[in-house]
Amino acid sequence: MGEFMNSGMGIILTIAAQGLLVIAFVMISLLFLVYGDRKIWAAVQLRRGPNVVGAFGLLQTVADAAKYIFKEVVVPAGVDRPVFFLAPLISFVLAVLAWAVIPFSPGWVLSDINVAILFVFAASSLEVYGVIMGGWASNSKYPFLGSLRSAAQMISYEVSLGLIIIGIIISTGSMNLSHIVEAQDGAFGLFNWYWLPHLPMVALFFISALAETNRPPFDLPEAESELVAGFQVEYSSTPFLLFMAGEYIAIFLMCALMSLLFFGGWLSPIPGLPDGVFWMVAKMAFFFFLFAMVKAIVPRYRYDQLMRIGWKVFLPFSLGWVVLVAFLAKFEVFGGFWARWAMGG
């Protein structure tokens, strides 16, 4: 048995099994994410939300997914059929692909590569192609305008996200997500995590993540009052389901990145309590709760306001922060205290 597992076929089967586990976790989480999002939104609006299908409405998401899958796929006249159907698949696959390098605990990662942050950033950046392809292939003005908005918005806020991540890389000296979490380990629990020395960047990362995932109040590419449903107007059935699933998976990915980069990942916030997967999942769930609350209580921005904030506020501030972190780390200002603190020392 040991010889087989060390053989080429054994390694391939092991990687395939691990990949299926990651996909299973993402898909099961997706069911609860949609359910939780709808429940939180309903609670803010003093409604009950899903409560009929299954206990407490837990099976409502399953019923909705089945409804989408078995619906007829309506293809409008004049669309580019290959590109039209390829677009949602690209968005979904890229959203799932990024989870291959997300560690949940020491050893609980599909591929613990040294350029994990770069891999995640590349996969999330490529998702914009699915949106652009879907809007262009639909042969309709509303999807096309929505896709153009989405492309401009995602590219604008990816710059800020990249600069924020560079600050973390400078502090850690590594692009490996496991190493970044290990650098935040210390005797003071949550006060060793990067949220404290990089506090301004936590807020910027959260807001940029909202814009990057087209989440309210930055859901301009699919603003109902302006573009109906944006680039998704002409989609129905399974293709629409893939777009929606990719969006929620990308949101949960941003929650995972916030947990890993700023809040210690699987590390316990209280010294003495054991570290583990529980803390990682709990932090991700908390950040998704914040995403859902923002959706429920913050009004939508105008498109010009969104772009102005991204280029005139977030970009210069995050760039200045990178310069500051690099200066403090290089010249060991304040006797090296800040550098050792920011580097987990």
Swiss-Prot record:
One of its GO biological process terms is: aerobic respiration
Q: What is its EC number?
A: 7.1.1.-
Q: Where in the cell is it found?
A: Cell inner membrane
Keywords of the record, alphabetical order, are: Cell inner membrane, Cell membrane, Membrane, NAD, Quinone, Translocase, Transmembrane, Transmembrane helix, Ubiquinone
| Species, as recorded | Cereibacter sphaeroides (strain ATCC 17023 / DSM 158 / JCM 6121 / CCUG 31486 / LMG 2827 / NBRC 12203 / NCIMB 8253 / ATH 2.4.1.)
Tell me the enzyme class. translocase
Q: Which reaction does it catalyse?
A: a quinone + NADH + 5 H(+)(in) = a quinol + NAD(+) + 4 H(+)(out)
Could you identify this protein by its name?
NADH-quinone oxidoreductase subunit H 1
Stored InterPro entries: NADH_UbQ_OxRdtase_su1/FPO, NADH_UbQ_OxRdtase_su1_CS
Pfam families noted in UniProt = NADHdh (PF00146)
Source species, domain of life: Bacteria
State any GO CC term.
Answer: plasma membrane
Function of the protein: NDH-1 shuttles electrons from NADH, via FMN and iron-sulfur (Fe-S) centers, to quinones in the respiratory chain. The immediate electron acceptor for the enzyme in this species is believed to be ubiquinone. Couples the redox reaction to proton translocation (for every two electrons transferred, four hydrogen ions are translocated across the cytoplasmic membrane), and thus conserves the redox energy in a proton gradient. This subunit may bind ubiquinone.
Per UniProt, subunit arrangement is: NDH-1 is composed of 14 different subunits. Subunits NuoA, H, J, K, L, M, N constitute the membrane sector of the complex.
- According to the entry, what is the taxonomic lineage of the organism? Bacteria, Pseudomonadati, Pseudomonadota, Alphaproteobacteria, Rhodobacterales
What broad class describes the main subcellular location of this protein? membrane
- Would you identify the family this protein belongs to, as annotated? Belongs to the complex I subunit 1 family.
